[in-house]
Amino acid sequence: MIAFQPLLRGATALLLTAALLPAYAADTLQRVRASQTLTLGFVPGDAPFSAGTPEQPSGYAVELCGLLGEQLRQQLNLPALQLRYQPLTVAGMLGAVAEGKVDTVCSAVGDTLTRREQVSFSLPYFAAGLGVVVRRDAPASLLTPINEGAQPRGPVWRATLNQGLNRHSFAVLKDSVSVDWARSRMRALGLQSELHEVASNAEGLAIVVEGQVDAFFADRLVLLNYQAENPRGHELLVPERLFEVMPVALPLARGDADWQLAVDRALSQVQHSEAGQALYARYFGAPGEQSQLLMKLFQRPD
């Protein structure tokens, strides 16, 4: 009997774990059903994706989540489902999802492997492009490399480029994926330039306008939006070049397959709908051929 006790204890523990797993996996759906509330986090100051207040949130991602909520009301048979918006910071948004404080985040959240260590992601709904903003009167030593999409290669070019770029300072949004990207590029090019981490996109643009840094890297659409709204936007230049492209998706709790499936199904239906396509066109204009192809790739058949 004694010899079998460890085996029995192990089997009991295994059964208890197995019994607990389904409950955990269904946690978000159970919470949404029980509370009749979908709690949506968003990062203010990230226009055109998310902006405003909890009472009046706005932006493409926020409105997309509104359409998602309508679809989930039907899909989950929850006609009384309410949407509650909660402002978050970039630093705290993934933790809020992982801890169940919000059900997802309606902002431009890039889907990366590092972030997947903390949360899961829905199907993509947008492809974000990392761009840069500089002053229009920036010197050629800065404008030339950031404007060129396909640049010359070789030790002579690299030495010349680095010598010019080393004179300049750069900024990125703190806790964003741009930080790791910028550090990686600076290491690869052997740059000794200053890299500043700012608290908001608005601050990043402001210090470029004031000449405190030479360039600020962020999502290109966000930069264009801020340039259009800034009284001194005419002094700024946002080149067409994209330095990095990544899928944007809704962060979800890890290990919650039922909730992820529900969100993916609703999101696919929203993107395929007339309302979803009209929403995209209102914020970004009629999608080009490449954008249409990406939208089709993002969707899944039911």
Residue spans for each PLM region:
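Extracytoplasmic small-molecule ligand-binding "clamshell" domains
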Residues: A26-V109, L113-E117, E197
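Beta->alpha turn/N-cap motifs
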Residues: G41-D46, Q86-A91, G100-T112, R135-R136, ...
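Periplasmic-binding protein-like
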Residues: V43-G45, F126-S141, R220-L267, A286-D302
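Extended ligand-binding regions for polar small-molecule ligands
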Residues: G59-Q71, R136-A159, L165-S169, V245-P287
